[in-house]
Amino acid sequence: MLSEKDTIVACSSPPGRGAISVIRLSGDKAFSIIQKITKNKLKKQISVVKFPLNADLIEKCVLTIFKAPNSYTGEDIVEISTHGNPYIVEEVIKKCLDSGAKIAKPGEFTLRAFLNNKLSVSYTHLRAHETPINL
């Protein structure tokens, strides 16, 4: 069951396809989760932060914040741009999960956008039929 109250996280970039991956965090707790992890206040729309992956590894990330309702989902969103290495992407997502986020189910960001009147029914039908061939 999908809950609109959960803050969700997922990688929005195709795995292993680029040097940079974007991890999206959406929901009421998106900002507080990132502040908890990075120990930074989100004062600017775009900022560079040190993202601790574990005791020995710190990743430098670019954070882009979108305040509700001015985001794709209509909720508060933090987009974390990080190196595309699958290990780093996985560790960033794990940190978000450990800090209170839930893993997003396929289509959940788009569903939230639709439920928050950010997308039309016809657009969501088009998104549901996208394939790597017609993108």
Q: What do these predicted regions represent?
A:
Residues M1-R127:
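A glycine-rich (often HGG/GG-containing) alpha/beta subdomain
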Residues H125, P132-L135:
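Single conserved hydrophobic/aromatic residue that forms the stacking wall/gate
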